[in-house]
């Protein structure tokens, strides 16, 4: 199962969940570790770092290590004996990554309607803690969602590690309004920025690519910021270096299906565009309704269909003022960032061979079309990829 990593000296400490099945096929989860050296060799740490707690079922996984004011901590998602989800906070004794002591269950105003907390991540934006997590089975009366499992977040005013508490916690919010974002992993970079990557693929959902033994992919790397109490997520600036050419946004009979659109929409306007469009105008429909204040994404006519039991459209409310949209298309992936990350739609799509056009169906959206070269290395990667101190490992649950 998934985990995280942190640089210690010349080694990268890998922290993850290992599962052992006994003769009765009962699962025993262990939080274990390994060291990745500069030579690329992995040496496993020959002991269990965190055992399954006595008050937890065998659903106990996904450790995230983080540094808070010079002290190393970790959180692990779990399910208690009442089949309710929780997040447990641990402290590294003397900052020794092989010696972990439980502090207690993280207090984040847990409503206790979810049966499992998967992939919890605690990241800091300034002094404010942001908890990203996947509350499986969350009661929709708490917060409505459309996907089989949600990915959500809460923001705190501050963090008290001694009490395992996020202080003055916000309401629960959907992290992404699209079809696929899950298990979002976040960390603080050396310069303090909060960065995140989402897994675009949901557990217990069959995908068209399954027949090729492939499922899921990563989102773009996103920087997290807080504005007016809202969490914004927007691709890191280095992504702009993938822009190979630019043209004025317009109808296009054919594209490479690897591009970015930077659109402007006037206040109180209504516009609809179709991406991955065929000659009949069938593809991903994106409707910007700034009269009623709503954005709707419809993939019901985009390629091979799947997961239709969870719906083929997604919507979210937006203000009716002038709006921007940055849309990234990469063959089977789309990511839509409204107002520079105020609202986000992420999803997969498996278009037919002739679905590669752009159609402005109604309205007068303006902007720029950027052809993207995903094979380019950005300056950010050249500067940081060799010595990034904090990574996240992901795996299917």
Predicted regions and their residues:
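Beta-rich accessory regions
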Residues: 152-385, 389
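Low-complexity, intrinsically disordered or signal/transmembrane-proximal segments
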Residues: 388-391, 396-397
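Beta-rich carbohydrate-recognition and catalytic domains
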Residues: 1-62, 67-113, 126-177, 200-246, ...
